[in-house]
């Protein structure tokens, strides 16, 4: 059977659905591991948004008269696995938070690419209701990525750099290390 753009769209939609469900399981560990209260709050907030993304994808399936089902997303699984490995490293607190931000942003960028593709394909096929739903999620993914950037640039990276290179003056004098010893993830 020859596949069409509609088939590719459904395949990508199933991939995104599975990715969001995997992230619902992974985000609590990121939140628990974060030492920065603001970073913890960002992960907790995005967990709630991610649950909403799952529900929205179910709405998109409904607009297409398709049953919601996922297709294992190897891409997000790999990103999550890399994040788990970083968590298992003995980072000091600020370094851990910087590594968590990097992991979170990898996931956000993956999702933004997926949603951008889904929106373009839905628009090309005239699935206007799906476009509207997917655009809402894409905007939330962009906002989550921006929030992580703000946290990284707002002191976490400087604090981690100050611990890594105490001989260098951090760009932000207010960036004080939160902790200096090695840190293992809370399980």
Q: Which residue stretches match the model-derived regions?
A:
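Amphipathic alpha-helical hairpins
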Residues: 1-187
């Amino acid at each position: 059977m020859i596949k069409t753009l509609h088939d590719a769209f459904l395949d990508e939609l199933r991939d995104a659905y599975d990715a969001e469900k995997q992230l619902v399981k992974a985000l609590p560990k990121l939140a628990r591991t974060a030492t920065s209260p603001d970073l913890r709050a960002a992960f907790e907030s995005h967990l709630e948004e991610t649950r909403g993304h799952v529900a929205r994808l179910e709405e998109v399936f409904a607009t297409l008269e398709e049953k919601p089902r996922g297709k294992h997303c190897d891409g997000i699984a790999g990103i999550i696995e890399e994040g788990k490995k970083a968590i298992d490293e003995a980072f000091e607190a600020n370094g851990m938070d910087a590594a968590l931000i990097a992991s979170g942003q990898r996931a956000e960028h993956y999702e933004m690419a997926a949603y951008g593709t889904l929106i373009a394909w839905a628009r090309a096929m005239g699935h206007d209701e799906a476009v509207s739903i997917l655009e809402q999620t894409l905007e939330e993914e962009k906002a989550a990525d921006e929030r992580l950037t703000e946290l990284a640039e707002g002191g976490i990276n400087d604090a981690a750099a100050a611990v890594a290179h105490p001989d260098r003056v951090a760009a932000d004098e207010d960036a004080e290390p939160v902790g200096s010893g090695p840190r293992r993830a809370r399980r």
